[in-house]
Amino acid sequence: MSSLAFNYIVNLLSRREYSEFELRNKMQEKNFSEEEIDDALSLCQAKNWQSDRRFSENYLNSRSQKGCGVGRIRQELRQLKGVSSDIIDEVLMESEIDWYEMAENLLRKKFPNYNEQQTSKMKQKIWQYMLSHGFRSDEFADLIGQNQSEWD
């Protein structure tokens, strides 16, 4: 194994968590061979310095605090970070995040003057906003029907 490859990964991991996929991409950009990449990653994983599960847990907490719903987080982890669906499912299942409450808080913050007498155009805008942030319709649909006094 190349100590240069190992040192490169350790240097990256000393700053923040990375998924295996991200580390592979960074090492390929630096022209490390597949063997060097595999060896360095295996050693870091054996020492528990790199873990896709731990990365996913941290990513979930970080993105949920920024108002992202489960759908968006799942998509980002899978497509952008290369985390396996099995790990994502486990992390989401074990998460103690109340997605309904999060959707309600996001809705209150973004649309503070909303009430149930709003036009269908406004309701459509809210619907699109919530879906684009990764919330499922069942997590916010009944919130749109609540009136402002129930939000206070």
Curated annotation (Swiss-Prot):
Entry's localization field: Cytoplasm
UniProt KW keywords: Cytoplasm
A single Gene Ontology CC term: cytoplasm
Organism for this UniProt entry: Haemophilus influenzae (strain 86-028NP)
InterPro entries assigned to the protein according to its UniProt record, in alphabetical order: RecX_HTH_1st, RecX_HTH_2nd, RecX_HTH_3rd, Regulatory_RecX, WH-like_DNA-bd_sf
Signal sequence coordinates: none
Top-level taxon of origin: Bacteria
One of the GO biological process terms: regulation of DNA repair
Main location: cytoplasm
Keyword hit for Nucleus: no
Protein's UniProt name: Regulatory protein RecX
Purpose: Modulates RecA activity.
HAMAP family cross-referenced by the UniProt entry: RecX
Membrane-spanning segments: none
Family of this protein: Belongs to the RecX family.
Name of the coding gene: recX
Pfam families in the cross-refs: RecX_HTH1, RecX_HTH2, RecX_HTH3
